[in-house]
């Protein structure tokens, strides 16, 4: 029997199927791309001033912390590794970028820079080198943490990672390196090229942060959907079985740490450019707790869940601070408890598990009402 379907119709059907699955993501991307202009139109303010500029800044923070939380999910959600030292990767990347631009990179202010097509070429090169240093620093820290995970597991490992992260935090505050790191005060006024300056060219920074978030998500998605990602999940479910079928769990845990640390370190490097600073707070346990909260709110083992959790924490945190002042963490804590009770798998995780059940319940609810209306 000969099939009547042509290759062209097959391609169109596969494209249609892909669009049906991906249209929410495409719509979200379109909305984020147009957001500065739409919001400027609504408020009647220029895109580079007032409320549009402020909310660009809020979303920049969301993009960066969405990537950071997603990197944490690769460990706790996909590989089953609970760590309290994730801030070391984020802060390490931030300090690597800030230290290089402040103390090592040549002066790339207007007087010394080469400008071609509106881009400061020296500044671009320095940013690339700083990014590579953030990446290398994150890899080294990831290898260090993974070396410990070979010998210690479970809650003991979580406590050791907390101690290791605290060591990084103490190092960042050490007065022995005050001329380099600023000790408790941190580094401030990190030189940033004019074309990416978050104050004077925030719209450019907004789109760079958006592209960064998309690329990091695609990279993480590629990893978790790959055979290596399947081994990550298998280690989470039953490490002994993974070892029995011939795989080396230690090697895959190391890979998970390196991938996670690289993503977190790059997010930290971008955050140092956004804040034009690097401070001990970035390496503190509070920054790790932020990633944990974002992941739990959005849904462990989902990638998109932690990104949504970052948006909820940052945006609602802003409004709660406006409404409740210094008491906003208490209010947010109560809401978080309610989320854990009613959405035990996080927003995205619970939706994936129970959306069909909720849809069927809604249909059963609508049928009697529609029949009565007829």
Feature map (PLM): residue ranges:
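Transmembrane alpha-helices and adjacent helix-loop boundaries
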Residues: 2-374
